[in-house]
Amino acid sequence: MPLAKIHVVEGRYDENRIAKVSGAVQAALMNTLRVPPEDFYQLIFEFPKKRFLHTPSFVGMHYTDDLIILDLTFIEGRSKETRLALLKDVNTRVAAAAGRPDDHALRSSRREFLLWSG
């Protein structure tokens, strides 16, 4: 049961554009982690610009007001290679959906299965 949290600045992403980003994240999870299509859990947050704070650039990446901050949480137990493949797949798909390769930052974490309920 992966959970994706998508954070954007209010007004920067219309319904169509956010749907593309959402679909890109889910497609990467299905492709890399082999989650079934019905295993779909996402929270989309829109923040006023004054509450969405970030550096203008970091490690060669240059951000605009279209920056997306992604937070992926999934059950532990997958290999390092699989986790790295997921990050690469999410990055590639979200960059294509959002329009700029620099405008997203991704954080992932793993949790014990016992900590999930559903």
Language model segments and positions:
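A domain-level signal for the structural core that forms small-molecule/cofactor-binding pockets
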Residues: M1-G118
